[in-house]
A protein has these predicted regions:
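Short, solvent-exposed loop/turn elements at beta->coil junctions and helix N-caps
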Residues: 48, 132-133, 193-198
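Conserved SAM/SAH cofactor-binding pocket of Class I
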Residues: 61-141, 145
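Short glycine-rich anion-binding loops that position phosphate/pyrophosphate groups of nucleotides
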Residues: 80, 147-150, 174
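Conserved beta-strand segments of alpha/beta enzyme cores
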Residues: 100, 124-126, 167, 188-192
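A short glycine-rich, Lys/Arg-flanked "PGG" loop and its adjoining helix->strand segment in the class I
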Residues: 155-168
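Active-site capping/gating segments
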Residues: 175-201
Length: 201
């Protein structure tokens, strides 16, 4: 049974992810499926076990090598159902690293869900039920953004509202190359691109 679960996460073999993490991921999937019957945690189109595992959990987990492990905090700009914030927090917990995750989420009901998940999985998170655009002078290590806002909007937010940070991780999607090309006309960025392991686009 254990090996069967671990094999479902074979795409993550080359990453810094412990075996214990996969069982926490399975618990997270169960909590998402249960809560998704009450509120829209994730799209109904991707709410089956395998879809959640690949399109949400593994997709979020693949950024772990870009997380600044020397920082005390990491921030997720609009975590929604906990992707990538909760997923990365699970990995960090099982790596025995001390790091707090500040997860911004405007929705009251999603915030309650995130607090419940954090409690059940013993995660070091602070669920901030607030529009991150209304916060300022934020200090953090890594900043994460997945399915949040367009790249130029995120860059403006980080530039205006963050006092300090180490690095910024943005999931770009299918039109990522085009958006990046347009953004570079206005922004002077030092960046590294990484091909997704869950999506050929």
């Amino acid at each position: 049974m254990e090996e069967e679960i671990i094999n479902k996460y074979s795409l993550l073999k080359k990453f810094n992810v412990s075996r214990e993490t996969y069982f926490d991921f399975e618990s997270l999937i169960s909590m998402i499926i249960k809560k998704n019957q009450e509120i829209n945690i994730i799209s109904k189109k991707t709410s089956k076990n395998d879809d959640i595992r690949t399109r949400h959990i593994i997709d979020s987990a693949q950024i772990i090598d870009f997380i600044d492990l020397n920082s005390n905090t990491t921030s997720d700009l609009g975590t929604g159902g906990g992707m990538p914030g909760i997923v990365v927090a699970i990995i960090i917990k099982n790596l025995k690293k001390k790091m707090k995750f500040n997860l911004y989420e405007k929705s009251y009901r999603k915030s309650l869900f995130l607090r419940e998940v954090s409690k059940n999985l013993n995660l070091d998170t602070e669920i901030i039920q607030k529009d991150v655009f209304l916060s300022n002078k934020i200090q953090t290590g890594t900043i994460m953004a997945r399915a949040f806002k367009p790249l130029p909007v995120i860059l403006d937010l980080v530039s205006n509202n963050f006092k300090s940070y180490k690095n910024l991780i943005i999931f770009m999607g299918k039109s990522g190359e085009k958006i990046l090309k347009e953004t570079l006309k206005k922004w002077d960025l030092v960046f590294e691109k990484k091909k997704s392991i869950t999506n050929k686009d």
